[in-house]
């Protein structure tokens, strides 16, 4: 399984629509960088957020998630409260090839500010926006800049196609648009 370079990522994005919209250059002046890099693609966070709140004093339960646990926010800058958590989504829509697994890692710019980004792997033949988990580990409010970089995606091509892809097993987050809350089937 090999890590894929910029030329492969560009070809798959342009010819097969693997990443839409696709930014062929790495944009970094005055913003948290995003776009194509040497061995990855820096994704952007959209201007849609769901910020966790304890107004209703509910327990967070992944099997029975209560939408009252989050507050919707739309804007150019999202303030994540101290020691709190938010969900967001990518600007980009992904179509992952059958023989590819993508791993996402947080950007150093945010990590150095105590902002931890988590995204689960993009499985073979996954299609959709990516829901991003953002943790503010600091005792201070933290800014997240919409339409700027938030994490980097690394693409790994398998030596052979998998027997069962995310699409084949009808993954519960397949074709997700917007921010998707936890689901149990």
Curated annotation (Swiss-Prot):
SUPFAM superfamilies: dUTPase-like. Pathway: Pyrimidine metabolism; dUMP biosynthesis; dUMP from dCTP (dUTP route): step 1/2. The keyword Hydrolase applies. One of its GO terms (molecular function) is nucleotide binding. Keywords: Hydrolase, Nucleotide metabolism, Nucleotide-binding. It holds the Pfam family DCD. It catalyses: dCTP + H2O + H(+) = dUTP + NH4(+). DCTP binds at residues 107-112, 152, 166, 176. Its EC number is 3.5.4.13. The active site is at residue 133. It comes from the Bacteria. It is an enzyme of class 3 (hydrolase). One of its GO terms (biological process) is dUMP biosynthetic process. Homotrimer. PANTHER family: DCTP DEAMINASE (PTHR42680:SF3). Belongs to the dCTP deaminase family. Catalyzes the deamination of dCTP to dUTP. This is dCTP deaminase. It comes from Nitratiruptor sp. (strain SB155-2).
